[in-house]
Design a protein with these regions (language model features):
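Active-site neighborhood of divalent metal-dependent phosphoester bond hydrolases
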Residues: 6-86, 105, 111-125
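Divalent-metal (often Zn2+) His-rich catalytic cores of metallo-beta-lactamase-fold enzymes
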Residues: 91-112
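Short, solvent-exposed loop/turn segments at secondary-structure junctions
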Residues: 34-35, 97-100, 150-152, 172-173
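Catalytic phosphate/metal-binding cores of nucleic-acid and nucleotide-processing enzymes, i.e., regions
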Residues: 49, 65, 99-102, 134-137, ...
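Divalent metal-coordination and catalytic microenvironments
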Residues: 2, 17, 31-32, 58, ...
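Short, well-ordered beta-strand micro-motif
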Residues: 85-86, 92-94, 180-184
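Conserved beta-sheet core of the metallophosphoesterase superfamily
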Residues: 128-194
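Short, conserved active-site loop motifs that form the nucleotide-linked donor/cofactor pocket
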Residues: 26, 90, 165
Length: 198
């Protein structure tokens, strides 16, 4: 998630993803910035906070984009998945979930792309997984893969795996790196700090 609002090329990124999925089987997850970009493209009045967190660059990038192209981008954003649960009980989502019984019971779909409490919980728990007080949310899935909350907040630009939650957001939306991870081996690759690419 968060294909939008990061830097100055949101329309080009969305065009690339739309074309790429025609050549390669893809599963795209919804991020909070994608949801916000959709609102902007639909004409909603956006607030200052959005503009300060990448929205200003998105507004500028869309100034000369045709209505037809904007519609294609809205359709693409509408097609994004909130989460993916694979056959090995590994959960992939942008941010987290809050329901103690898991994703199937989440009452507010926005939590999949706005929640930070899952990562905060994973970072704060020191109990062994076998302890009866170990948080249920961290026991439901074999592995959980998220982004949304940069690992740079914990002083590193590397992905972190804590209590079964792998966070691969290494701050690309700010001055960090873009990271991809092989979920089988946990090997990862990173870009240069993204701001150096512009």
């Amino acid at each position: 998630g968060d294909y939008a609002d990061g830097w100055s090329e949101t329309p080009e990124v969305l065009d690339f993803l739309i074309e790429y999925q025609k050549k390669q089987r893809c599963l795209f997850l919804r991020g909070n910035h994608d949801a916000l970009c959709r609102e902007f493209l639909l004409g909603k009045e956006m607030d200052t906070l959005w503009r300060l967190h990448g929205g200003k660059a998105t507004e500028k990038a869309y100034r000369n984009v045709s209505a037809e192209r904007k519609k294609a981008h809205i359709d693409f954003i509408n097609s994004l998945e909130n989460y993916y649960l694979d056959s090995k009980n590994r959960l992939f989502l942008h941010a987290g979930f809050t329901n103690l019984r898991g994703i199937a019971h989440e009452h507010f779909e926005q939590m999949y792309y706005w929640d930070r409490t899952l990562w905060e919980l994973a970072c704060s728990v020191s109990l062994p997984k076998t302890d009866k007080y170990y948080p249920n949310r961290l026991k439901l899935y074999n592995e959980i893969y998220i982004g949304h909350t940069p690992t740079t907040r914990l002083g590193t630009d590397k992905p972190l795996i804590i209590n079964g939650v792998a966070n691969v957001d290494t701050g690309a939306g700010f001055k960090g790196r873009l990271t991809v991870m092989d979920i089988e081996t946990k090997q990862y690759w990173q870009s240069e700090p993204v701001y150096k690419l512009y």
